[in-house]
């Protein structure tokens, strides 16, 4: 439009200049030409220019020969030019018809227009007349000039031709001879024809003419308005057929009457001056004067004013109509119908002139082109679409603004462009305004211009477009809260953008692959190229690490220094793994918790995968980060974790055999790090997506590198579980390593100070304490198996406390407990549970002072299952000899544990026996089996290893030559003990690794004396123990405090019982003096009834557990022991047990007094040894009772003298409340003839002393007998919760239920209850079943007045 208006203005300026030149041209034409009357038809090619072809037709009163003479020379001169122009015209038309249609966008404003004045019938006739005249004169007539058409309607063409013909009929324009003006116009004509061959026109020598009062178009028509409708579609090839049709329509228009002519006269000003600038005629009219020309100009100006007023009225009507259409409810429908019916646009950029022009275009087009692809059809379609879009924009403006505010979630003026819409909704919600219901069925069209007409529908539309009631704030928002809300919204927006970007990046596999590979190469220093050079250099000239450690393995200072350097070197590598994880796409979007969880769980895995190429299986070594080589044997000797090292090397060899590339290693590291199955992750969805994409990238790389190995990816992923297992083992090892070495320097300084004090004080220094006074129980203190709560009850008394109290033995001078605690406070605190230090590994006891009196039994003994060790065992030879001469049965569980337990421990030294490794002659190594996680006790790295370990098994760690010598010497010493004391029946089993058959004890002392550093190491205090820490954690709990209280009571009760048994045994008859062989070598479970004082009973009970294959893992903590214990008693059973104990305690004194009456009065069968079957039954059913009593072999005959019920007292936690009526001399022996049964509520075993079951005999049916003396018969007892309490007259005693011990499924046991009314102690004889009558029946007391009630119980 702008270009069109500029062109129109330029044309108007040219026309004004031509109007000024018009009077001068007219005067020249009047002077130089004769007055001749002729009609001139002008064929004008107009682009504001001047290609004119004038054909003159003489009038009837003028002779033909004059005109012929005048123009003869002219036509002859023009004949050649015309022929050439016709040829050019013909060629241009052919090219134009054959060319493609010209698009609207390619048309320029300056286009040449064909003007043909044959639309009116008179003009057609004149053209035919001229053609006939030219044929007579052998001249070719002027034909149509070819141009391209413009884009507007052809109504202006009709106006132009009509105006021309009207002016010629009235003879208003006088044109005379053409020669004077010919000089002014030929150059533009030549230039114009030269620019384009298709724009050629017929030039004339004298195109002089007068201008037909051209004026600017007041209607504002565009430049593209054409003047001939026939050529609006130049790309159609049916041009001549359409031309004939147009002629017929024009004939109908001429015969329409004078109305059509008046309309044509009323529109002379509508001539598009941009296309036609001048109209030329060559025949002057003498009748026309300047006055007539002035009148013509006056008429044209009046007509222009009339047209302008009409256009203004139409514009006003259209605007009103547009306003009405917008206000209507169905505006869209009206817009569509209006656009289709009328082309008068409702566009914001259109004016009234354009609207009128569009109407005229439609009127002219209806009579013209019938093609759908015509220019006019395009214009009408475009205008209708433009109007529709304009209306849609106005209608949807508020909706778009509302949607934009709804997307941000806040209704603020900063978000929306219109503050009123926001304020209306906010006021409506805050003030709770109730608007009047809509009267138009609630279907009002809410637009920007009419939104205030119906507030009800306006509020309804606000809610419909997404405005939220919750987003409206009632009151002022604080600045802090507002800033927080804005920050949260901004963060949410950024997160959404990052997530979209991440999704795009993850979906783009090449991009993800490139990012991961770039991250791996930038953060990993150990690529295949670099590592290959390092491995080659290590093979050619290796530089081994840790030479100082190998030279002096007991000196920890160089190792600590190297470890610090090692940690510093690894810090950079670990940092590289962290940076690599951060560069993985999507990792930065995770929360801090998820990042920490993934890195903590997968850091070692990824690091190990990166460094897997540093393992060289060809030289059986590993290349350190500094380029040095560390041999596999050195790692084993230093860390003493062979299983972990072997597993690591095997896994490395397995991974290196796959020959992974750098790309595969990088992607595999990413998969190891980004694993969705880590516990504690929150954003699982994102992590799973990342994992799947990374796995797809790895699959793509593997398929590309190894097309012939389709199962390679599955094989690679199968290594992840093994990798995690190694990571777990390594982490456990690091935890222990970190815990130990925090106190390493302080502990060594402490040991050095104690070692200096040990030179002058042999019996008072810490070394003297470890060498002399530290017996098995005190020094050994297996913290891994004995909890700190039990250690609190230990007593640092002399070893004589473990001896029988009835025998006085000369003992060497011992240190007092107070002196021990004062000289070794750390050890005392350790044993009492106050300081959770762990015992050092391989730290045996050495004694340079008093070496002749000491015997080093073993340097250390391992507790197999949990990786803990026992500290050195130092034992006095005199004490050992005294105990062996006396033949005490419980010497295996006293403080000198190593002396009498040689056979059992040597059997346990065998690899197939994994039991308590506490032997006097053998030292047991730790099992390096898959159960070993690689966690050692703490100082395994300082062990002096053997140079050649050819005789070691593949499942054990290599030991030093010192250990081998000690093992062999211990075996030899044990063999000597067996020879000297054959009654112990010690079965000697040679160690597994014994290069020498026997070694003297002097060699052991010499080895220790020659190695003072080893002596100090072995005398060093224990290190921290994680098991003790766990025990300390459980200690404050009230549940375990209660258990400790019960255990203490149980220990006291059992100790008193075992003490009385020892006294009676020592003062027994000569029959009992020889020790039976069947009791001399009991298994550890059967020999667990040794007597002890109350102070040591708890530790004693724990070390002598009844289970034959008790795993030390079960004694890892109090909780583990409680879980491994036997079933607990129900509250009802506990109540019954308490009642029984109360009644038993009442008769303890009377039972003790009654035992002194029958000394030596025993039946012959009572002193016999029970048969092996009975012993087997005893061992079989020893721990099967779960109620209140343990099984015992019932005596087949009871003498009348054995009526006293001297039962061994037991606490509520002890289930061994069995009290058989025995003789005075063997009451305790018969009572303890069965195994001790552990309480469900205690973590230690009882201490019933195993004695000779001489009171038992061959009994076909073992019965369970319980005798209870009730002092007061007026107190009834209710033993069952379900059964009612029997009346006191019928029930005067307690009936206790027990599990029968017999092989048969059912057993009837006789329980004899005797009630006593304060008289002498009553005795009840329990008869055997009817099938087996007793051999001798004891006669009851004649003074017995209570009835005997027998209760048969089905088991």
From Swiss-Prot:
Pfam families assigned: Hormone_recep, zf-C4
Biased composition (Acidic residues): 200-213
Record's subcellular location: Nucleus
MF terms in GO: DNA binding; heme binding; nuclear receptor activity; RNA polymerase II cis-regulatory region sequence-specific DNA binding; zinc ion binding
NR LBD domain residues: 508-756
Keyword match RNA-binding: no
Listed CDD domains: NR_LBD_REV_ERB
GO terms under biological process: cell differentiation; ecdysis, chitin-based cuticle; hormone-mediated signaling pathway; intracellular receptor signaling pathway; molting cycle, chitin-based cuticle; negative regulation of transcription by RNA polymerase II; oogenesis; positive regulation of transcription by RNA polymerase II
Keyword presence, Glycoprotein: no
Start and end residues, zinc fingers (NR C4-type): 387-421, 438-457
The protein's name in its UniProt record: Ecdysone-induced protein 75B, isoform A
Gene behind the chain: Eip75B
């Amino acid at each position: 439009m702008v270009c069109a208006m500029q062109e129109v203005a330029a044309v108007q300026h040219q026309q004004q200049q031509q109007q000024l030149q018009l009077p001068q041209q007219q005067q020249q034409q009047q002077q130089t030409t004769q007055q001749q009357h002729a009609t001139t038809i002008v064929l004008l090619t107009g682009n504001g220019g001047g290609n004119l072809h004038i054909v003159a037709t003489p009038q009837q009163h003028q002779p033909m020969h004059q005109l012929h003479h005048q123009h003869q020379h002219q036509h002859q001169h023009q004949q050649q030019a015309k022929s050439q122009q016709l040829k050019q015209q013909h060629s241009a038309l052919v090219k134009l018809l054959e060319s493609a249609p010209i698009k609207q966008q390619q048309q320029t404003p300056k286009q040449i227009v064909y003007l043909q004045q044959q639309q009116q019938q008179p003009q057609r006739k004149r053209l035919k007349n001229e053609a006939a005249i030219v044929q007579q004169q052998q001249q070719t007539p002027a034909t149509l000039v070819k141009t391209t058409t413009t884009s507007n309607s052809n109504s202006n063409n009709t106006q132009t031709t009509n105006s021309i013909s009207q002016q010629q009929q009235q003879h208003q324009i006088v044109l005379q001879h053409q020669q004077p003006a010919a000089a002014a116009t030929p150059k533009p004509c030549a230039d114009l024809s030269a620019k384009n061959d298709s724009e050629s026109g017929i030039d004339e020598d004298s195109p002089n003419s007068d201008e037909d009062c051209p004026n600017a178009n007041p209607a504002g028509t565009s430049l593209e308005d054409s003047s001939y409708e026939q050529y609006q579609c130049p790309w159609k090839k049916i041009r001549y057929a359409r031309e004939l049709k147009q002629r017929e329509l024009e004939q109908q228009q001429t015969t329409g009457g004078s109305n059509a002519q008046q309309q044509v006269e009323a529109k002379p000003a509508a001539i598009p001056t941009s296309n036609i600038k001048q109209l030329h005629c060559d025949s002057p009219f003498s009748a026309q004067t300047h006055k007539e020309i002035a009148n013509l100009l006056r008429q044209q100006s009046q007509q222009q004013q009339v047209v302008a007023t009409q256009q203004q009225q139409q514009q006003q009507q259209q605007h009103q109509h547009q306003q009405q259409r917008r206000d209507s409810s169905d505006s869209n429908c009206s817009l569509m119908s209006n656009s289709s019916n009328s082309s008068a646009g409702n566009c914001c950029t259109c004016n009234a002139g354009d609207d009128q022009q569009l109407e005229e275009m439609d009127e002219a087009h209806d009579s013209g082109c019938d093609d759908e692809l015509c220019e006019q059809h395009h214009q009408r379609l475009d205008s209708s679409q433009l109007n529709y879009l304009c209306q849609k924009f106005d209608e949807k403006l508020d909706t778009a603004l509302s949607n934009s505010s709804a997307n941000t979630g806040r209704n603020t003026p900063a978000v929306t462009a219109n503050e009123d819409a926001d304020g209306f909704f906010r006021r409506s919600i805050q003030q709770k305004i109730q608007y009047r219901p809509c009267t138009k069925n609630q279907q009002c069209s809410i637009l920007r211009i009419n939104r205030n007409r119906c507030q009800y529908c306006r509020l309804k539309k606000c809610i419909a477009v997404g405005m939220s009631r919750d987003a409206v704030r009632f009151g002022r928002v604080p600045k802090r809260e507002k800033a927080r809300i804005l920050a949260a919204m901004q963060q949410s927006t950024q997160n959404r953008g990052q997530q979209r970007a991440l999704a795009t990046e993850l979906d783009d596999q090449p991009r993800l692959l490139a990012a991961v590979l770039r991250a791996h190469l930038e953060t990993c220093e150990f690529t295949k190229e670099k590592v290959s050079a390092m491995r080659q250099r290590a093979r050619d000239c290796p530089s081994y690490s840790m030479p100082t450690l190998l030279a002096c393995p007991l000196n920890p200072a160089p190792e600590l220094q190297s470890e610090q350097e090692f940690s510093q070197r690894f810090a950079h590598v670990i940092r590289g793994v962290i940076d690599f994880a951060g560069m993985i796409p999507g990792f930065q979007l995770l929360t801090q918790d998820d990042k920490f969880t993934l890195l903590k769980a997968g850091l070692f895995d990824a690091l190990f995968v990166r460094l897997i190429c540093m393992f060289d299986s060809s030289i059986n070594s590993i290349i350190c980060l500094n380029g040095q080589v560390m041999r596999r044997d050195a790692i084993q000797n230093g860390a003493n974790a062979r299983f972990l090292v072997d597993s690591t090397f095997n896994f490395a060899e397995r991974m290196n055999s796959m020959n992974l590339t750098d790309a595969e290693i990088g992607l595999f590291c990413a998969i190891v790090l980004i694993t969705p199955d880590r516990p504690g992750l929150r954003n699982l969805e994102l992590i799973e997506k990342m994992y799947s994409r990374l796995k797809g990238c790895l699959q793509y790389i593997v398929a590309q590198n190894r097309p012939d190995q389709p199962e390679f990816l599955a094989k690679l992923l199968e290594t992840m579980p093994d990798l995690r297992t190694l990571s777990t083992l390594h982490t456990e090892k690091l935890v222990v390593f970190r815990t130990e070495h925090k106190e390493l320097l302080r502990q060594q300084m402490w040991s050095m100070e104690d070692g200096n004090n040990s030179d002058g004080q042999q019996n008072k220094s810490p070394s003297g304490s470890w060498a002399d006074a530290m017996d098995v129980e005190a020094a050994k203190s297996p913290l891994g198996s004995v909890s700190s709560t039990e250690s609190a009850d230990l007593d640092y008394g002399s070893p004589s406390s473990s001896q029988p109290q009835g025998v006085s033995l000369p003992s060497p001078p011992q240190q007092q407990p107070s002196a021990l605690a004062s000289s070794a406070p750390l050890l005392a605190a350790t044993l009492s549970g106050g300081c959770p230090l762990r015992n050092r590994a391989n730290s045996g006891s050495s004694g340079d002072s008093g070496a002749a009196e000491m015997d080093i039994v073993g340097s250390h003994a391992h507790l197999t299952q949990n990786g803990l060790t026992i500290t050195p065992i130092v034992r006095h030879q005199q004490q050992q000899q005294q105990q062996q001469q006396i033949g005490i049965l419980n010497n295996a569980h006293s403080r000198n544990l190593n002396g009498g337990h040689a056979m059992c421990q040597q059997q346990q030294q065998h690899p197939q026996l994994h039991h308590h490794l506490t032997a006097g002659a053998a030292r047991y190594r730790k099992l390096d089996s898959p159960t070993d996680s690689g966690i050692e006790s703490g100082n395994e790295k300082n062990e002096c290893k053997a140079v050649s370990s050819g005789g070691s098994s593949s499942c054990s760690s290599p030991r030093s030559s010192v250990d081998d010598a000690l093992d062999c010497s211990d075996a030899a010493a044990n063999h000597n003990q067996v020879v000297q004391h054959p009654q112990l029946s010690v079965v000697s089993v040679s160690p597994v690794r014994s290069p020498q058959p026997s070694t003297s004890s002097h060699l052991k002392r010499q080895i220790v004396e020659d190695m003072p550093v080893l002596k100090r190491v072995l005398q060093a205090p224990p290190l921290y123990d994680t098991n003790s820490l766990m025990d300390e954690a459980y200690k404050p709990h009230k549940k375990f405090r209660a258990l400790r209280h019960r255990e203490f009571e149980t220990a006291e009760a059992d100790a008193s019982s075992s003490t009385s048994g020892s006294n009676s045994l020592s003062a027994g008859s000569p029959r009992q003096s020889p020790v039976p062989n069947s009791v001399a070598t009991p298994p550890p479970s059967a020999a667990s009834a040794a007597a002890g004082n109350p102070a040591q009973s708890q530790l004693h009970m724990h070390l002598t557990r009844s289970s034959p294959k008790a795993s030390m893992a079960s004694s890892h903590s109090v909780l583990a022991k409680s879980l491994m214990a036997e079933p607990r008693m129900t509250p009802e059973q506990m109540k019954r047990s308490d009642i029984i104990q109360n009644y038993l305690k009442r008769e303890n004194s009377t039972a003790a007094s009654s035992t002194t009456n029958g000394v030596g009065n025993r039946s012959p069968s009572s002193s016999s040894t029970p048969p092996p079957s009975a012993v087997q039954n005893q061992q079989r059913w020893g721990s099967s009772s779960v109620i209140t009593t343990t099984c015992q072999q019932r005596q087949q005959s009871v003498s009348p003298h054995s009526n006293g019920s001297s039962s061994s007292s037991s606490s509520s936690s002890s289930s061994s409340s069995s009290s058989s009526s025995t003789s005075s001399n063997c009451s305790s022996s018969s009572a303890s003839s069965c195994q001790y049964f552990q309480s469900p509520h205690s973590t230690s075993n009882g201490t019933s002393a195993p004695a000779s079951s001489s009171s038992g005999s061959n009994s076909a049916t073992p019965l369970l007998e319980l005798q209870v003396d009730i002092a007061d018969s007026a107190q009834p007892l209710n033993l069952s919760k379900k059964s009612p309490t029997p009346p006191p007259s019928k029930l005067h005693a307690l009936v206790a239920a027990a599990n029968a011990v017999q092989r048969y499924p059912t057993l009837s046991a006789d329980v004899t209850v005797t009630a006593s009314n304060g008289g002498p102690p009553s005795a009840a004889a329990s008869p055997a079943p009817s099938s087996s009558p007793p051999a001798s029946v004891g006669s009851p007391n004649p003074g017995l007045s209570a009835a005997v009630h027998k209760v048969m119980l089905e088991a």
